[in-house]
Regions:
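Short conserved AdoMet
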Residues: 7, 66, 80, 130
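A short acidic, Gly/Pro-enriched loop at the edge of an enzyme's catalytic core
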Residues: 39-56
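Core SAM-dependent methyltransferase catalytic element
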Residues: 125-192
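Conserved class I S-adenosyl-L-methionine
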Residues: 84-113
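Class I SAM-dependent methyltransferase SAM/SAH-binding core
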Residues: 1-44
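A short glycine-rich, Lys/Arg-flanked "PGG" loop and its adjoining helix->strand segment in the class I
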Residues: 69-84
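Short alpha-helix
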Residues: 105-137
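A short SAM/SAH-binding and catalytic strip from SAM-dependent methyltransferases
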Residues: 54-67
Length: 192
């Protein structure tokens, strides 16, 4: 609601890398929900380049991402100054799930700090975003880690530069193409 009592128009978007699958499931079960758009938090500024978003919500998804810190940087980047990134996640889900499937990162609160970690790396989110964001972190009633990150300045371009990502994606694509073109590719999973 605006100060003069009028309702402010909202443009709410739902994004997920698996949008096509979720949309099919919702259609199959005749769910009346907004359609989910394809998008990846690690590349959010490619989908929303205008830097005028007020709120980004990431719920139970950072632990699934390929690069949680890049997801945070990109999410802050698309926000207007003063905009907020809200995070809500199960505590240390990768440990709970034994690093199986999508669960490759843990998210927790330690000594009042938001920490993202796995067996190979550990990140203090407030420390890594100190020059362009303010962070508060707590626990919800259901025991999830919740954080609000408010954008205070522009994200340094070096943190959202995607040239290295493009190289890695091209290498991954070429490796998959080599594997797929192997005459043995179809046999690997067919023997049971």
């Amino acid at each position: 609601i605006m100060r003069d009592g009028r309702l402010m128009p909202l443009d709410i978007r739902y994004i997920d890398p698996l949008a096509a699958y979720f949309n099919r499931i919702m259609a199959r079960h005749r769910r009346k929900m907004p359609e989910i758009e394809f998008g990846m938090a690690e590349y959010l500024s490619a989908f929303y380049p205008s830097h005028d978003i007020s709120l980004v919500v990431i719920q139970n998804a950072l632990d699934h991402s390929a690069n949680p810190m890049k997801s945070i940087y990109e999410s802050i980047d698309v926000l207007k100054k003063g905009g907020c990134l809200y995070l809500n996640h199960h505590i240390n889900e990768a440990e709970t799930e034994h690093y199986k499937g999508f669960h490759q990162y843990n998210i927790c609160r330690e000594d009042g700090k938001l920490i993202i970690w796995n067996k190979n790396e550990r990140h203090d989110v407030a420390e890594l975003t100190a020059g362009f964001a303010e962070l508060t972190v707590g626990l919800t009633e259901n025991g999830h880690v919740a954080a609000v990150i408010r954008k205070t300045a522009d994200v340094p371009q070096s943190l959202i530069d995607d040239k290295g990502d493009k190289r890695a994606l091209c290498s991954l694509f070429m490796e998959n193409a080599r594997t797929a073109s192997s005459p043995w590719h179809g046999l690997k999973n067919s023997a049971a």
